[in-house]
From Swiss-Prot:
Keywords: Coiled coil, G-protein coupled receptor, Glycoprotein, Membrane, Receptor, Repeat, Transducer, Transmembrane, Transmembrane helix
Membrane-topology annotation of the record: Multi-pass membrane protein
Gene Ontology CC terms, in alphabetical order: G protein-coupled receptor heterodimeric complex
Record topology, Cytoplasmic segments: 718-731, 780-806, 875-890, 941-1407
The encoding gene: grlP
Positions of PbH1 repeats: 93-118, 129-150, 254-279, 452-476
Family designation: Belongs to the G-protein coupled receptor 3 family. GABA-B receptor subfamily.
Keyword presence, Transmembrane helix: yes
Glycosylated position list: 43, 58, 162, 179, 182, 230, 241, 270, 368, 391, 464, 512, 539, 544, 554, 571, 627, 646
Residue stretches in coiled coil: 1315-1344
Protein name: Metabotropic glutamate receptor-like protein P
Segments on the Extracellular face: 1-696, 753-758, 828-853, 912-919
Cell compartment(s), UniProt: Membrane
Amino acid sequence: MKFKKKNIYWVSPTKGVESMGCGLVKEFPCKDIGSIIDKITPNVSTIINLMEGVYRGNFSYLMTNFVILFKGEGRDKTIIDLEGRQRFTLCTISDIHFKDLTIKNGFGNAISGIFDGGAIYAYDSQIHFVNVALIDNTCSASGGGIFLYNCYFNVEHSLFQNNTANSGGGFILLLSASNITNSSFLHNRVFQEGKGGAIQVFISFMSIELSLFAYNIAPYSGAIDMVGGNLTSKYSKFIENHSNIGGGFGLYFISNVIFESCEFIGNRANSTGGLSFLTAQSMLRFSLCIFKDNFAPNCGIVESHSISPLLFESCSFTGDVPTAVQIALYDNYCFLKVQNCHFSEIQGVLMYADSISNIIIDSSSFTNVSNRIIDVGNEADILIISSTFYNITIDEYLVSLSNGNFLAYNMDFNNNIVLALIKSSVGGSVTIVSSSMSNNYVSTSLISLSNGYSVYIENCEVKNNTGLFKGCFIDTDHTGSETIVQSLFENNRSPFGPILYFSNPETMLSTNYSSNFRDILFSNNFAAYSGALVYFSQNVSLPNISCTNCIYDNNTAVFGELVNSAFYSFNVSITPVIYPFQDLIIEIFALDFFGNLVRGTSDLGFFAIPCSDAYVEGNLFAVLNENGSAIFSNIKLSSNPNSICNLTFLSVPIVSENGPITIPITFSYCSQDRELVMIKSIYYCLKTIKVTSFVKFLVGTLAAILLIILIISGFISLKYRKKRVIRYSNPLFLCIILVGCIIFLITIPVLFGSTSATCKIRFPIIVIGSCLVTSSVFIKQFRIWRLIKDIQLLRETNVENKYLLKFISILMVIPIIIVICSFFIFPTHEKYTFNQRDITITHYCSDGSYLAYVIIFLVYQMAILLFGCYLVIVCRKFRSIPGTFNEATYIGILIYNYTVVLIVAIPLAYVFNKNPLANFLIFSISIIVFVLSTIILLFIPKFHFLLRKKVIISSLEKLIKEQEAIVQRNKDILYFYDMYLAEERTGIQQQQRQGNLYNNNSLGRSISSNTRKRSNNNINNNNNNNSFNMTGFSDSSSTISNPNLTSFTSSPSSLNSSSDSDSTPDFNDPNFLEYYNERVKNYGKRKSIEKNKINNSIPNSPKSTTSLPTSLPSSSSSSSSSSSSSSSSSSSSSSSSSITPKSNTPILSPSSQSSKTINKGGSGSGNSSSIPNYQNIKSPNTPKSNKSSPNLSIPVNKNSKVSKLSSNQISSPKSIKSDKSPITIKDFDNSSDLSDSSNSLKSDSSIGSEQFNEKVINRIFNIHQDKKVKTTKQQSDSTLSSIGSDSSPNFNENINNPNINPNNNNNPNNNNNNNNNNNNNNNNNNNINNNNNNANNNNSDTDDSSPNFNENIEKKNVVKTKTNFLNQFHQKKQKDSDNRKNYNISPINISDEKVPPLSPINLSKRK
């Protein structure tokens, strides 16, 4: 506004003065505005320049016909503070302008209810605000900042903030006009029940542009309240205004409001109309607006009660704020149009109408909404044109109408997961044209219709939709009509009826409507249960479905056809004739209206109601399964045979259209494998439990095979009864065993069934068969034990048939008594037991005394067999010689087997007596094992021995060769030991020349008690070898030839001691001592004879030959006697071998040496020690004739732990220890100084060339010299160790022949053996005499000894150097090598390891 003629005044609260001439110039301003107002002339334009400062004082100016411009220097500089007690002005018919200033803290009281406004009250005036701030003004009535009545109010770039009133917090416009541009209304407030937190308009016109309304609060209409008038708002924002109703604005009484390009964000209402509330024909239009997060519990955006249109054009709706409805139409004839809008992420029902309303949606899109889009009722009409619904996931219907009409054209429903797209009820009509529905997941169907409807579908595509629970496209109760033309249905899936799903109507409306299809293509539609296209649920009325020009392509249902219905009727399948208590299987088939099975469902059940005179057991209710049938299983009916019972069947919860079904059942007699039994007035047909035919056939076949084997075994035993292997086993014994086994096998067919006859004879047969076998075997084992005992006591050992039969008769007394009692006195009878649960009956054999029979029989058998086991243990160490049949071993195993079988079988058979199959298998398997073990252990080995005689002889020959190798190996080891005892031999030879060799007292002292005891045991064992044994045998005609052996004869001795037994004679035994003394007395007499024989056999023996002793010590005599005894017994009782060397072969024999007494350092007496000497006697002039050559006999005894050599050949150096010699065998065994040397000696078990490590010999020589020096200092106090002492090993145990038997002459069974022994003794005595003669000749030339190893070591004064020692050793070994070549025995290879001990010769070893 321009002032042509104006008055200008200046006012300054700080520089102004109070004078008459003030204010006319800027330099002399007035201090108070009121002084200027008094000077102003009405209707004269006046400018009042308000200089910087805060103006306070008394205002409330009354201005009429004033034209004034209040101009300040800025809103922050020029401030009019009304101090909360006054208004600034009350103006009428004036034109007041405010610019660049702030008016605050105004307060207005209503004057007679007319004058309101906290800062300004204007009437018939014009008020202009330019860059004005109206702040913190309050009015007790209306218009917290300004009240305008019939005024024009222009606002530019101004601020209304924190103004309060009972209504119109910012200002009130009454019958006025206002233009607001670029202004802000912030935090204005209305109290009590007022309206319009920022502006209240009464029948006025207002235009708002580029303004902001934010955070204004009022009970109603949070920002703008409009009662009549027009409001146009452009490019403005309404943000977070708050009220109870109409959070942004409220329109009442024919208001017309247009918002263009506005934003409505976060406006809230406590009740409804979060953004706007419309009543009374108010029209609201939004164009290009944005709605976001507006909220109210009932209606979030607009609630309309106006019949005027509500229009949304090109708007966007977003916001995830929970609310019931976004846009609501509550009055009749409301109209809503949504055009080209986009809705996304909206909660609550988007559009709701509960009355006769019209909703039009044109070219809009809906996505990601969380509730229904349209929900209308009461004849509301919905028109959707060219709109899309996609990516919506809700558990609601997208469009729901009740008694309304739905029309859609060019609509797309894609990728939605909803309860249904369209829900129409109560007479609704649905018309869809040229639309598409694809890739949707629906819980019920795409279109759900009920309670009177009509649906028309034309030119639509329904593809790839999935129905989750019912159908897929249309779900209807068949109370309306369906018309579908020129459409495509492809790849739709649902459990039932993908195209049409007819459910049961909820009302009594007629279902006589038609379903018409024309020009339809049905392709690849699929039903997971029934109805590939159409399905009728629950009760079905007469369907009237027609399809004209329809094409069906690959439409399938898992449990149905193209058209199926729910349950309609059922049929019953049952056996009309049954026997009492038969397992009855009843099957019911559920059918649909079209006669197809109702499959794929289990919501139907059936009851069976029996007749009153029959007994019923089982479940009388069955549930329909997926294959369309219900089965009653485990039902048992029982009644008197030839009676009839009626069974009635009915369905629940759906009653069949045909009603219940009754079927008669006839009872017959039992079948062949069952027995009729009445228990507690109930008839049962019980199944007989018995052994299956297959088991009978299998076990019977095995028994027959065993019977054939037994017969063949008996035939072979009789045919070869004169053979020693059969004869020694006693053919009668074998026949009794065969008879017992055959009787035992007869039990198996008796066990096939339990009848009175089989029960009576079953137990006696078992007792007789088993006792015959076990008693015979026990008597055999007992006789073996007695045989061993008789041999030890030198009694009669022959076994006679009479003896066998006598004891079998004795042992069979108790079994015969048991048989008589169980067969005649208290026989077992057939009994039975039944199982009502399994409907079975079991026959078994039992009696009151049955358990007593079993216990007595078991105790008796166990007593015999356990005693037999004891006898087996006692006799376990007795084994047969190689090449003989050891029957005792097999008898022992057989007794063990019988014991185990009877211990296991009898108790188990009693426990399972009432189980036919188990009882039969236990008995049958036990009998088969019993008989089979008897055949395997008693007959097969004998037949095998008969057929494999040559193989056994070859095995023996190989065994003897191995023993020869061990003998030669022991000889070489003894040679090695002799090298370190050579020094001691010189002293011993001197003692021999003094005649101390025959000192019996020293010999007696040298023999240990343990040696004597072991010798006595071996004597007894050898007595057993000389005895006859019926359990062991060998072929007397078989002779094993060997190039190195003269002869080998097997003897039938089989009960020999084990290989672990000792063979040294016991010198404490009086029998042995008496025999020993007798041999010593006769030794002198034989000496001359032996000397002559030796001279005759070696006439040209040179003097240089090593001399043999002229006489032997007691130990040598004893050994000679033992050797003689062993040689004599080798032909009759034990296996021995004789090696006959060639004519020029040197003879290996021990040199008899006398003991020598050594006194050193005074009168102390020395101890005597006897050390044998082992030499190879080379006789180059010995004739080649075998008769004149002395024989080297190596008797072999299988009882000894090591090889047994006669004392004429080998004496042990291990039992000799001299105080003069620093090295003994004991030293080698125990000395730590020699441990390295011992460990460096290595023995090779193979027979090859002999080698020695000189490093080992050097170490041994050095240790020998060191120990000699040490022992020389202790010679005066040392004593000689006795021969065979307990502290050192006694080699006499290994070489003493244990075959000396002083009681041989007293045994009448051994007369022949004694004669043979005497002959052998004579031969051995001749050999001894020859050896003694050689020894005498050699002794006579001892001083003139030949240059051999012994002559060199006799020179005491010669210093023994290492070189001499090695030379002597090599000379000695060279002679040994030559001797072995003459005997055809390869030398032993001795390497750097420890020298092994003497290896035992064990003839008990067998392949």
